[in-house]
């Protein structure tokens, strides 16, 4: 019997959209037969800033039982999904801070040949969603990872906004739309399937 693909979903979320996307990705991974670790990156924002936003405080409480990602989690993984909201056209400082802890794994080649895809969200359609995904993929390219963006491999990509780089959601404080959820499911299922093929 073939061992399940080891999938790490590493996310940052301030007000809940990213957490919802990561949960959807985790469910899709399990449905595809993967062993899944759902992991948040460490919060680095000052507490007084967080306390000034009710949605942020509520989301931190909702995520309290989600373990924090470590380099060891990425060493374990065979497939990696990063999810970060857009901040000024790139990933959040919290996600970048986590990425900056991975130098040891990178220098020893332990991130090479893992599959990688990415997801993001922003408050508006032109809020830097594509550039955020591209910068995350650029990081994975430095690792020697195998990029597995969804492209236009399913009709749902067009229905959810047409982003070939990865699932991207225009956040408005509401639950994820079904097309967004379906796009995430397709992306993760495809990545798990491709990873299994690469592992032989």
UniProtKB/Swiss-Prot annotation:
Residues 7-199 form the Flavodoxin-like domain. SUPFAM superfamilies: Flavoproteins (SSF52218). Binds 1 FMN per monomer. It catalyses: a quinone + NADH + H(+) = a quinol + NAD(+); a quinone + NADPH + H(+) = a quinol + NADP(+). Its cofactor is FMN. InterPro entries: Flavodoxin/NO_synth, Flavoprotein-like_sf, Flavoprotein_WrbA-like. GO terms for cellular component: membrane. FMN binds at residues 13-18, 86-88, 121-127, 142. It comes from the Bacteria. Its EC number is 1.6.5.2. NCBIfam families: flav_wrbA (TIGR01755). Homotetramer. Belongs to the WrbA family. This is NAD(P)H dehydrogenase (quinone).
